[in-house]
């Protein structure tokens, strides 16, 4: 309860929760419907999807997570506002690669787009978790992190794939099997929103630190 109230009272932490929701909305939608996309649109077998898509997603997420943390630490030097900028640029860069993933006619080119979109898509996570921990009281950091993770799970898994399914049903009469392609294009808006909100977060973080200095441990 205490951690929840702290998150509600802090503009920075509230925004971080929204950022997590926007990014996970796009991320889990692609993970959930990506295999269907490759099977319907590119005619892949389930074995091909498991191998090729799995490699692109796993590789992108691994490099993106490690790279985002490394870049944020090196560039920010402890400045939480700069951490937010790293997260913002990463998620915005993910959107054009997401379009390449979805709109490319060649399946291999689509997989390249998927790899880089996943790489940049995950740039939001290490910096924003670092900011959430640093902006929280020491005794509540575990619960604040839990709230952040819960928000990604509830919105990402609970709403993202459902939204794509509804959009697919609406678009299928007009686009047939291509409906899944355009249904997934809509969720890329979550990445753009996430990136823009990260830049808004730089101001909120600086303002909150100036009003209530926090010593990160």
Give the ranges of each region predicted by the language model.
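Extracytoplasmic gate region of multi-pass secondary transporters
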Residues: 9-68, 120-129, 156-164
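Primarily residues marking transmembrane-helix entry/exit sites
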Residues: 9-17, 107-111, 142
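A membrane-interface helix-boundary motif in multi-pass transporters
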Residues: 45, 82-85, 168-191
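Loop-to-transmembrane helix entry/capping segments in MFS-fold secondary transporters
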Residues: 46-50, 138-148, 177-180
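Helix-to-loop junctions at the C-terminal end of transmembrane segments
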Residues: 64-80, 168-169
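Paired intracellular helix-loop junctions of major facilitator superfamily
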Residues: 76-78, 132-141, 172
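C-terminal transmembrane helical hairpin of 12-TM major facilitator-type secondary transporters
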Residues: 78-128
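Multi-pass alpha-helical transporter architecture, strongest
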Residues: 95-104, 185-217
């Amino acid at each position: 309860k205490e951690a929840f109230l702290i998150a509600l009272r802090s503009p920075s932490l509230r925004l971080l929760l929204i950022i997590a929701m926007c990014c996970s909305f796009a991320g889990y939608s692609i993970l959930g419907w990506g295999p269907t996309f490759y099977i319907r649109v590119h005619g892949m077998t389930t074995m091909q999807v498991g191998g090729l898509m799995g490699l692109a997603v796993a590789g992108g997420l691994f490099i993106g997570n490690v790279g985002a943390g490394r870049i944020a630490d090196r560039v920010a030097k402890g400045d939480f506002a700069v951490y937010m900028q790293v997260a913002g640029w990463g998620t915005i860069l993910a959107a054009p690669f997401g379009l390449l993933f979805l709109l490319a006619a060649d399946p291999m080119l689509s997989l390249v787009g998927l790899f880089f979109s996943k790489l940049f898509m995950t740039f939001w996570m290490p910096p924003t978790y670092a900011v959430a921990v640093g902006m929280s009281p020491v005794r509540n950091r575990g619960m604040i992190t839990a709230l952040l993770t819960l928000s990604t799970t509830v919105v990402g898994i609970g709403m993202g794939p459902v939204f794509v399914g509804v959009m697919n049903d609406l678009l299928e009469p007009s686009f047939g099997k291509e409906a899944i392609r355009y249904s997934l294009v809509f969720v890329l808006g979550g990445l753009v929103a996430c990136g823009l909100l990260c830049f808004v977060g730089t101001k909120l973080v600086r303002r909150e630190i100036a009003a209530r200095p926090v010593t990160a441990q």
